[in-house]
C-alpha cells in the first residue's frame, strides 16, 4: 500500500474512532452517564474498560473494511467504502451495547439519572460483547462480495448466538451468574467473557470460510461450521479445564472464594479451544 494511502487511512481511522466516541457519549448522556467525568473525574475503572472495549470493537470492524478496500479501484471508492462501513460499525456496536443490556446483563445497568459505573465485572462483560461484535464485523466487512445487508445479517446471527451461548452456560452453572456479576464478582465475569470472545472468533472464521454459491448455500455452510465449532469448543473446554484446574471445584472457587484466578482460567479455556478449533476447521 502506498504511503499516501496509508496516511489517509490512518487519519480516517482516527476520525472514525472520534466519531464513535462522540456517538456513544451522546447516547449515554441521555441515560445519565457522563463518560468523561466518570473516567477522568471519578477515575471509574468500569467506565474506562467498557469504553476501551467499544473502541477496540469499532477498530476491528474498520480493519475488516480496509482489507476489502485495498482491492477497490480508485482512491475515492476506497475511502468511501471504508467510511460507509465505519459508520455501519458504529451503529451496530451501539445496538449491540443496547442488546447486551436487555438480553445478557438485564438488571445490571445503573438506573437512568445516576452517575456511577463502578461495577468492573459488568464492564468487562460489556467490553467483551463489543470486541466479539467487532470480530464478527471484521469478518463480514472483509468479504468483497458482501454488502451492508450481509454485514447486518451476520451481526444479527452473532448477537443471537452470543445470547444463546451465555444463557446456556448460565443454566449449567450451579450459581446465579448475573447475581454474582451484580455483586462485582470478577471471577464470575471472566467465564462469560471467554465465551463471548470465543464466539466472536468462531463467527469471524465462519464468515471467512463460507462456501461459494447462493445465499442459502452460504448460510448452510456457515451454519455447519458454527455448529461443529461450538460442539468441539464445549467438549474440548471440559477437557482443558481438567488440565488447567485439576481437582478444583470451579463453582466453589468462583462464588465462595471469589477467585479471579479460577474465573480467568475458566474463561481462557474457552478462548484457547476456540483458537485451536477455528484454526484447524478454517
Language model: regions and residue ranges:
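Alpha-helical transmembrane segments
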Residues: 1-18, 76-93, 146-162, 217-233
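Membrane-interface helix-loop junction between the first two transmembrane segments
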Residues: 19-41, 173
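A generic, lipid-embedded transmembrane alpha helix
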Residues: 45-67, 128-134, 193-205
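Membrane-interface helix termini and inter-helical loops of multi-pass transporters
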Residues: 67-76, 140-149, 177-178, 207-219, ...
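Membrane-interface helix-loop-helix junctions at boundaries between adjacent transmembrane segments
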Residues: 74-88, 97-125, 145-149
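Alpha-helical transmembrane segments and their immediate juxtamembrane interface regions
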Residues: 84-109, 160-183, 228-250
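Interfacial loop-to-transmembrane junctions
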Residues: 246-267
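Juxtamembrane boundary at the C-terminal end of a transmembrane helix
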Residues: 274-282
Amino acid at each position: 500500500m502506498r504511503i499516501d494511502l496509508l496516511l489517509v487511512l490512518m487519519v480516517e481511522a482516527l476520525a472514525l474512532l472520534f466519531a464513535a466516541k462522540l456517538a456513544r457519549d451522546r447516547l449515554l448522556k441521555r441515560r445519565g452517564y457522563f463518560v468523561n467525568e466518570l473516567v477522568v473525574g471519578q477515575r471509574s475503572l468500569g467506565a474506562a474498560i467498557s469504553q476501551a472495549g467499544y473502541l477496540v470493537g469499532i477498530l476491528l470492524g474498520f480493519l475488516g473494511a480496509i482489507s476489502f478496500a485495498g482491492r477497490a479501484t480508485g482512491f475515492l471508492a476506497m475511502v468511501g467504502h471504508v467510511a460507509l462501513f465505519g459508520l455501519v460499525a458504529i451503529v451496530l456496536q451501539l445496538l449491540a451495547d443496547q442488546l447486551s443490556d436487555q438480553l445478557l446483563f438485564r438488571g445490571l445497568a445503573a438506573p437512568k439519572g445516576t452517575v456511577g459505573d463502578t461495577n468492573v465485572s459488568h464492564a468487562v462483560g460489556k467490553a467483551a460483547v463489543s470486541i466479539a461484535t467487532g470480530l464478527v464485523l471484521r469478518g463480514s466487512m472483509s468479504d468483497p462480495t458482501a454488502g451492508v445487508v450481509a454485514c447486518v445479517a451476520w451481526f444479527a446471527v452473532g448477537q443471537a448466538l452470543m445470547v444463546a451461548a451465555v444463557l446456556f452456560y448460565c443454566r449449567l452453572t450451579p450459581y446465579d451468574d448475573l447475581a454474582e456479576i451484580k455483586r462485582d464478582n470478577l471471577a464470575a465475569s471472566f467465564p462469560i467473557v471467554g465465551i463471548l470472545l470465543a464466539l466472536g472468533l468462531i463467527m469471524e472464521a465462519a464468515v471467512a470460510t463460507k462456501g461459494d454459491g447462493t445465499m442459502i448455500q452460504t448460510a448452510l455452510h456457515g451454519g455447519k461450521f458454527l455448529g461443529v465449532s461450538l460442539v468441539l469448543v464445549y467438549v474440548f473446554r471440559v477437557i482443558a479445564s481438567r488440565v488447567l484446574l485439576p481437582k478444583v471445584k470451579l463453582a466453589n472457587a468462583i462464588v465462595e472464594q471469589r477467585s479471579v484466578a479460577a474465573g480467568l482460567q475458566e474463561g481462557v479455556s474457552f478462548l484457547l479451544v476456540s483458537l485451536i478449533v477455528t484454526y484447524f476447521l478454517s
